[in-house]
Amino acid sequence: MALVETEYRGQVMVVRMNRPDRLNALGVQLRAELAQAFVEFRDNPDSEVAVFTGTGRAFCAGEDMKESLERGTPGRGAQPLENPFMDGTLDKPVIAAINGFAMGGGFMLVERTDLRVAVRGAVFEISEAKRWLLGGYGHGLIAGL
């Protein structure tokens, strides 16, 4: 089963995380499929804008800690992949459609977008801050929100 679904609606590419049973938590496979989707978006001359969302009651709950613990790398995430969305080289707009939780790494994904639209009751949280920890590199973008 694909953890990231893409569909085209004219010049709009919809990128949807599809791991609702884990609140779209960021595991190795989901990260790889997101990277692939955003490379496809970047390279498609017919795509002008992407709408980025998640299936179920969460946009993204952040790092998949269960998978991270099984890998033996708790809290460190997976190895970086070529992802024009995350590395700042994407020159097309991305709109976040936030349908619930955007926590930790999910909040970081929201930070990378150009426009954010959220349902009433959406939850934004940087969990690391509750424990006086430094979050991922993306949290430096908060000032731009």
Functional labels for PLM-detected ranges:
Residues 55-59, 65-67:
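Short active-site-proximal "capping" loops at secondary-structure junctions
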Residues 18, 63, 99, 121-122:
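Histidine-centered beta-alpha loop that forms part of the nucleotide-sugar donor binding/catalytic region
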Residues 83-91, 97, 103-145:
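CoA-thioester-processing core
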Residues 1-55:
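Conserved CoA-thioester-binding segment of acyl-CoA-metabolizing enzymes
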